[in-house]
Amino acid sequence: MKFIHLTDTHLIEGGGNLYGSNPNQRLRQAVAHFMMHQPDAEALVITGDLTHYGEADAYKQLREILSVVNKPVYLIPGNHDRRDVIKDYFPSIECDENGFIQYTKDFGDYLAIFLDTNEPGVSWGVFCEQRSTWLRKQLADSTKPVLLFMHHPFFPIGIHSVDAISLRETAPFLDAIKGFESRIQQIFFGHIHRPITGSYRKMPFFTLKGTNHQVALDLHAEADAGIPGRLEAPQYAVVCLSLEQILIHIEDYLDESPRFSLKG
């Protein structure tokens, strides 16, 4: 199975600019690019911060932009999102029994679990006992290898201002996955606006640049210095799944540099 991973689209009302770039246009360009170059992808996943201010019109535009995608689209909220407005504009989105936007899908041989770390009014992530109980049940009810999708990382990534707004009170999350770590084959994040890959307690993780603006790589500034922004080029990921391999390619979809044959 092949799917596309996008994150942090940050659409705004009226389709204007944000930090000197146009998030709505950037998303349209991403969609057009992967529809042309990856037509055999079977799904699109967007890991949160779908909009920047949570405006109804921004979700309306998101729905319109994604309407041309001829494959299933799976969304989760980020800290910039409003869960209630997502449900208004995407009424078929699945939720757990407590109203959190959490659900599972079969991705080929894998169980894909989509998690909700949104907490209204704050930038950091929250994963409460209700969400933890739901996650643990999904893990217990399946024997498949697992892909986790969530907006906030649950460990530090070294950019201190971003770490300050990652998942807080990680115990409920870690309790939920305890004993299932060996089945978690890949964790996909948003929130960071940087291409990062590695592993945490032997669980591989991956995140990438957003489609509008990025976070600069500064591993020295203190947390209270503010999040350092940059207008680096946006990306999407092409993820290829088999039982033997999880392969992730990163596409700089606005790159227009010439292609040429490498000889000798």
Describe the residue ranges of each PLM region.
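His/acidic metal-ligating clusters that form di-metal
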Residues: A30-A43, W124-F206, V238, I246
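Binuclear metal-dependent phosphoesterase catalytic core
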Residues: S21-N24, A176, S199-G264
